[in-house]
UniProtKB/Swiss-Prot annotation:
It comes from Acanthamoeba polyphaga mimivirus. It is a multi-pass membrane protein. Belongs to the fatty acid desaturase CarF family. This is Probable fatty acid desaturase MIMI_L630. The keyword Transmembrane helix applies. Keywords: Membrane, Transmembrane, Transmembrane helix. It comes from the Viruses. GO terms for cellular component: membrane. It is found in: Membrane. The chain crosses the membrane at residues 9-29, 79-99. Pfam families: Lipid_desat.
Amino acid sequence: MLLTIIDKFIQIVLGYLLSDFIMGIYHWIKDTYFSPFTPIIGKTFIWGSRLHHVRPRYVLEFTDKDLIIDSAKWTLSWIGPLFFWFGLTPFLVTMFIMISLNDVIHKYTHEIDHERPMWATILQRIGFFQSHDEHHLHHIAPHEINYCPVTPYVNIWLEKINLWRKLESFVEYLTGVKPRAKEYEFVEDEKYPAGIRFLE
């Protein structure tokens, strides 16, 4: 009985931490490579990431419900087969929940205390959700640290081992592609979301 409880607890902790690492890799790729003008993925994935660096609080325009549904849909597309093969394990369920919540957790880091739900502020203060101060480090140009948006813990470990710079050096060695090779200029244009139009 005790061993079963310990096993489930370890699975939950690992799922919690791995979900943050997975989202960190995803955000690192979006922030480091490609552009808002890359065919197919530019408009669907990269554009929003670049816009967020220019207008960080634009994320507040989206409801919690919409953010959760959008994240849950794409998460289920790849974690669904794992549920089928391995069952609803505590590890996989925790990963699914935390990745589905990642955009909302990220949104809360851009809100001040009276804007976010009290329960979210409490979870930030007890170290379960990432806080504003922890996420703020990512928004210091050139946006090359603290890519993991969920927990207060994973970024610390990854920055200590300098993971992102090592990965970037490896990618450049293999492909010749430099990280953040071009920062795209923009102009204010009310016809575009958040009033920002990127210049190619």
